[in-house]
Amino acid sequence: MFSRLIHIVQSFSKVERLLFYGALVIFIVSGAILAIEATDEYTYKKPLPGGRYSEGFVGQLTAINPILTNNDIDRTISKLLFETLDALSESIKDDGKRVWTVRLKDNVLWHDGEMITSDDVVFTIQTIQNPNAFSPLFTTWQGVVAERVSEKEVRLTIRTPYVFFNDNLKDLPIIPKHIFDHIPPTNLRLSEYSIEAIGSGPYKFDSYQKRKDGFITKYTLALNDHYYGNAPLIHFVDFKFYSSLEDLVVGFNAGEISGFGTFDPRITKEISRSHVVYSLLLPQYYALFLNQNSSLPLKEKNVRLALDYAIDRKRIIDEVFLGHAITVSGPLVPGSSGYSPSVNVPKEYNPTKAHTILESSGWKPNSDHRGIRTRRLGDAIVLLEFTITTPDTPLLVKTAQIIRENLEAVGSKVTLDIVSIDSINKDIIPSRNYQITLFGNITGRQPDFFSFWHSSQRFYPGLNLALYQNKSADNLIESIRQNSDPEKRQSDLTTLQSAIIQDYPVLFLYAPHYIHITEPRIKGFDAKWVLTPAYKFDTIKSWYINTTRALR
């Protein structure tokens, strides 16, 4: 049959052969197109279990124990290894005031096969409350009494009503008592279980690699075969560690890792391989916190108002963050729970108005001081000068440089004090030894303003970095924490935001986006908003690499 067809074609004239072959090509191409369309119409790509994802980090893990984590690396890995009380609970009920009862799910196991019980919950809370454990959660859990009711039930009692306690309870990560019970709290970070962790999450510890100098280069997780819930599709997750962001990007370009995260969008210009960029919003903002106790000019509200008008936030967002940030007008990020658009009016860049306010307030350019504005206060001539203290990170240093330029343009003198992150956290912030500090606040899931804005938190370990004092604001903060009526609580939140904004204790700047970068083959990532960078892995159960086709 085939040889006869060839014989027939050979008998064609040259023109007939061209027409025949043209028709044949059209037939084959049309058939292929129809086949593809039919495949797309009657089948779909279905995620398939398997594959390996590798996340890159700059730095090192220190303790994979969720009640001890104080950095994004430890928090990220811990979230995949340990479950929260919300995930482990069948029910969480409260009496509407001060008592919560938690019922754990049946047959939920630790990675080593041991049963999770109420003893683990009580042990976790009591360990956090032990000052020798140095848990970052210590303050949050003071005054909470945890009692074992039965093997699967726990009762928790708080001293005073607190409407946000339910969220604290749900977010509480649980650690195994049978692993840590015999380890002194001071040694928890040194325990081998802070590396070779035993948790209850969808992934379990598999292995790690380190250099001779002790630097851990790779930490691997595998699917938890005891997991009680829907398992992720990706079977292995590697965390690879680099000494610098530059080395990490080289690793990504070389295919060593599948993805990484950063707050610095400028790094995308250094990527040479195909990639996908996700820009995620967080409840985190940066601002200039003003210490009025250390600067006479800052005590004047009109000076603070003028400085606010002088700052070009759009320029900061465009030049420093390449547009991957939004302006912030108050103590909550847009989209956060409790945010009130009506009082968070967008900040106006108006250096002319800043000049006018300073002039009308008596701050005049002084030729004896190179044109810097001065004002007589009592017997002294006071210069309009400030020192801005900022951590030594590229994004914040660049931000501070733009702000210095803005403020000097309206007649002030600005000195930048650039210090290490370690010095900021251990010395500068605890002592409040700054005039102005460029720093960030993570506001969290719920709008609890107490740590950041209540006057009792003006000094360490409180986080009221502006040393803000306002009795009305204190009363509102206390009311918000205790009032279970959502309408009244939102009304108080709106009033509180308005009060803080109008007092100008802080010059609010921007909320940066968190940039998540992956290979195109990593599918299923759909997060738009995350509480912290570690929370991007909350959606890992929907991530996939391998696919197959299935009938619709």
Can you say where each PLM-predicted feature lies in the sequence?
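Append "and occasionally in soluble cytosolic enzymes with long acidic Gly/Pro-rich linkers
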Residues: 218-222, 299-405, 495, 549
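Detector for C-terminal structural segments
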Residues: 36, 310-344, 395-404, 427-552
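Gly/Pro-rich hinge or "lid" segments in bacterial periplasmic/extracellular proteins
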Residues: 172-236, 246, 351-360, 545-552
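Ligand/substrate-recognition segments at binding pockets and active sites
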Residues: 26, 214-217, 364-443, 514
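Surface-exposed binding/hinge segments that line
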Residues: 33, 137-185
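Aromatic- and charge-enriched surface segment that lines or borders ligand/interaction sites
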Residues: 91-134, 155-157, 251, 297-299
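Ligand-site clamp/hinge motif
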Residues: 224-270, 404, 413-415
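N-terminal lobe/hinge region of extracytoplasmic solute-binding protein
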Residues: 56-104, 126, 198
